Protein backbone atom coordinates (compact mmCIF):
# COMPACT_ATOMS: atom_id res chain seq x y z
CA UNK A 1 0.00 0.00 0.00
CA UNK A 2 1.37 3.41 -0.97
CA UNK A 3 1.99 5.87 1.82
CA UNK A 4 1.73 9.62 1.62
CA UNK A 5 4.85 11.64 2.29
CA UNK A 6 4.95 13.29 5.70
CA UNK A 7 6.05 16.56 4.09
CA UNK A 8 6.20 17.95 0.57
CA UNK A 9 9.60 17.67 -1.11
CA UNK A 10 11.73 20.28 0.66
CA UNK A 11 15.16 21.52 -0.27
CA UNK A 12 17.08 24.09 -2.29
CA UNK A 13 16.56 24.85 -5.97
CA UNK A 14 19.11 27.04 -7.73
CA UNK A 15 16.80 29.04 -10.02
CA UNK A 16 15.33 31.76 -7.80
CA UNK A 17 18.69 32.65 -6.28
CA UNK A 18 21.18 32.07 -9.10
CA UNK A 19 19.19 31.69 -12.34
CA UNK A 20 21.57 30.54 -15.08
CA UNK A 21 24.70 31.33 -13.07
CA UNK A 22 25.35 27.88 -11.63
CA UNK A 23 28.44 25.68 -11.40
CA UNK A 24 29.93 22.66 -9.72
CA UNK A 25 31.67 24.46 -6.86
CA UNK A 26 28.46 26.29 -6.00
CA UNK A 27 26.53 23.01 -5.83
CA UNK A 28 29.10 21.49 -3.48
CA UNK A 29 28.97 24.57 -1.25
CA UNK A 30 25.15 24.61 -1.22
CA UNK A 31 25.20 20.95 -0.19
CA UNK A 32 27.61 21.69 2.65
CA UNK A 33 25.50 24.63 3.87
CA UNK A 34 22.38 22.43 3.90
CA UNK A 35 24.15 20.11 6.34
CA UNK A 36 26.19 22.61 8.39
CA UNK A 37 23.27 24.95 9.07
CA UNK A 38 20.87 22.17 10.02
CA UNK A 39 18.54 22.25 7.02
CA UNK A 40 18.99 18.53 6.36
CA UNK A 41 18.12 17.67 9.95
CA UNK A 42 15.07 19.94 9.76
CA UNK A 43 13.72 17.91 6.81
CA UNK A 44 15.16 19.73 3.81
CA UNK A 45 16.49 16.81 1.78
CA UNK A 46 16.80 17.96 -1.84
CA UNK A 47 19.56 19.86 -3.64
CA UNK A 48 18.21 20.69 -7.11
CA UNK A 49 20.08 22.07 -10.13
CA UNK A 50 17.65 24.05 -12.28
CA UNK A 51 17.83 25.14 -15.93
CA UNK A 52 21.08 26.02 -17.78
CA UNK A 53 23.18 23.09 -16.57
CA UNK A 54 23.61 21.40 -19.96
CA UNK A 55 25.36 22.05 -23.24
CA UNK A 56 23.30 23.95 -25.83
CA UNK A 57 22.87 20.78 -27.92
CA UNK A 58 22.71 17.05 -27.27
CA UNK A 59 25.74 14.88 -28.06
CA UNK A 60 26.10 12.64 -31.14
CA UNK A 61 24.11 9.90 -29.38
CA UNK A 62 21.26 12.29 -28.62
CA UNK A 63 22.10 12.44 -24.91
CA UNK A 64 22.00 15.43 -22.61
CA UNK A 65 25.49 16.47 -21.53
CA UNK A 66 26.45 18.67 -18.60
CA UNK A 67 28.30 21.84 -19.58
CA UNK A 68 31.95 20.91 -18.87
CA UNK A 69 32.89 24.53 -18.12
CA UNK A 70 30.27 24.75 -15.38
CA UNK A 71 30.41 21.11 -14.23
CA UNK A 72 33.87 19.73 -15.09
CA UNK A 73 33.34 16.46 -13.18
CA UNK A 74 29.81 15.89 -14.48
CA UNK A 75 26.49 15.30 -12.78
CA UNK A 76 27.25 11.88 -11.28
CA UNK A 77 30.07 13.51 -9.32
CA UNK A 78 27.65 16.06 -7.87
CA UNK A 79 25.00 13.40 -7.18
CA UNK A 80 27.56 11.26 -5.37
CA UNK A 81 28.67 14.24 -3.27
CA UNK A 82 25.08 15.20 -2.40
CA UNK A 83 24.32 11.58 -1.45
CA UNK A 84 27.46 11.37 0.69
CA UNK A 85 25.99 14.16 2.83
CA UNK A 86 22.71 12.30 3.35
CA UNK A 87 20.75 14.44 0.88
CA UNK A 88 18.91 13.76 -2.37
CA UNK A 89 19.96 15.12 -5.75
CA UNK A 90 17.50 16.76 -8.13
CA UNK A 91 17.73 18.09 -11.66
CA UNK A 92 15.65 20.09 -14.09
CA UNK A 93 14.19 19.23 -17.47
CA UNK A 94 11.21 20.27 -19.53
CA UNK A 95 8.41 18.68 -21.57
CA UNK A 96 8.77 21.12 -24.48
CA UNK A 97 11.19 21.20 -27.39
CA UNK A 98 13.48 23.47 -25.33
CA UNK A 99 13.78 24.35 -21.66
CA UNK A 100 12.47 27.71 -20.52
CA UNK A 101 15.99 29.15 -20.98
CA UNK A 102 16.40 27.57 -24.44
CA UNK A 103 18.50 24.49 -23.65
CA UNK A 104 17.70 20.96 -24.90
CA UNK A 105 14.72 19.46 -23.12
CA UNK A 106 13.21 16.02 -22.88
CA UNK A 107 10.53 16.27 -25.59
CA UNK A 108 10.70 13.08 -27.66
CA UNK A 109 13.67 11.94 -25.50
CA UNK A 110 11.82 11.11 -22.29
CA UNK A 111 12.96 7.50 -22.01
CA UNK A 112 16.54 8.28 -23.00
CA UNK A 113 16.74 11.18 -20.54
CA UNK A 114 15.19 9.13 -17.73
CA UNK A 115 17.93 6.53 -18.24
CA UNK A 116 20.58 9.26 -18.24
CA UNK A 117 19.23 10.86 -15.06
CA UNK A 118 19.07 7.44 -13.38
CA UNK A 119 22.67 6.66 -14.38
CA UNK A 120 23.75 9.93 -12.75
CA UNK A 121 21.92 9.08 -9.51
CA UNK A 122 19.16 11.68 -9.80
CA UNK A 123 16.48 11.26 -7.12
CA UNK A 124 14.12 14.08 -8.10
CA UNK A 125 13.15 15.74 -11.38
CA UNK A 126 11.70 19.22 -11.67
CA UNK A 127 9.79 19.04 -14.97
CA UNK A 128 8.73 22.34 -16.55
CA UNK A 129 6.30 23.05 -19.40
CA UNK A 130 7.91 25.58 -21.76
CA UNK A 131 7.91 25.59 -25.58
CA UNK A 132 5.11 23.07 -25.95
CA UNK A 133 2.03 24.86 -27.24
CA UNK A 134 1.07 21.95 -29.52
CA UNK A 135 -0.10 19.58 -26.81
CA UNK A 136 -1.88 19.77 -23.51
CA UNK A 137 -0.30 18.42 -20.33
CA UNK A 138 -3.13 15.89 -20.14
CA UNK A 139 -2.52 14.72 -23.72
CA UNK A 140 1.22 14.43 -23.19
CA UNK A 141 0.68 12.39 -20.03
CA UNK A 142 -1.46 9.86 -21.84
PLM regions and their residue ranges:
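Short N-terminal amphipathic alpha-helix/helix-capping patch enriched in small hydrophobics
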Residues: 8, 23, 27-30
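Aromatic-lined carbohydrate-binding/catalytic grooves of carbohydrate-active enzymes
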Residues: 29-134, 140
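Residue-level detector of secondary-structure boundary/capping sites
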Residues: 3, 25, 135-138
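Metal-dependent phosphate/diphosphate-handling catalytic cores characterized by acidic Asp/Glu clusters
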Residues: 4-5, 26-27, 73
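Short linear motifs at secondary-structure transitions and domain/linker junctions
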Residues: 22-24, 100-101
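An acidic-aromatic substrate-binding cleft motif
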Residues: 1-19
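Second-shell loop/turn segments in exported
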Residues: 15-22, 66-68
Amino acid sequence: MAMLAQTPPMGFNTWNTFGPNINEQMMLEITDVMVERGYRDAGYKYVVIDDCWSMRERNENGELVADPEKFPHGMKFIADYVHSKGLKFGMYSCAGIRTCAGFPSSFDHEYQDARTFASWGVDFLKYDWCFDEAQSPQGAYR
